[in-house]
Amino acid sequence: PGGFACINIGDATRTIKERFSLYTNHARILSAAQTLGFSSLPCILWRKQTNAPNKFMGSGMLPAGAYVTLEHEYILILRKGSKREFGKEADKQNRRASALFWEERNAWFSDIWFDIKGTVQSLGDKTARKRSGAYPFELAYRLINMYSVRGDQVLDPFLGTGTTMAAA
C-alpha cells in the first residue's frame, strides 16, 4: 500500500484521412489507472524542447492552419492504496537516509520542469528504429528519489535502454 507509479507520456498528433488531430494519451492513461484503483496526484509538466527548428506545424506562415508544437510531456503521478506508513524503526531510518536537500525539494516538487533537456539517443542498430524512446537519466533519478526510499524496489516494465536501472 502507498506505492507510487510515475508515467512519462506525451500526447501525439496525427493526420488521418486529411484531418489533423491531437491524441490525449495522458488523459487515456489517467482514466485507465483510475479504473484500476490508482489515485491520481498532481502531475508534472516536463518542458521538453524538441529538436525541430520550427515552432509550429501545419501551413507555416499562413494563418488559420498552423499548429503549435508539442514541447512538453506529462509525468503522471499515481498512488495505489492509502498513504504509506513508516511504523518500523528500520523503515523510519531508511526514510531519513533518503531525505532530500532543501534546494532539490524546492526545484523537484514544482509542477513544471524546465531544466531537463530531452536528448536524441541513437540505438546504433541500422535495422531497428531510428531513435529510442529513452529519457534523460536526470528524469528517472529525480522521480526515484522523490517517490521512494532506500531499500524500495523500483520497477520499469519496459526496461528499454536501462536508464531507470542506472538511476535506481
Sequence positions of predicted segments:
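Core catalytic lobe of class I
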Residues: 1-168
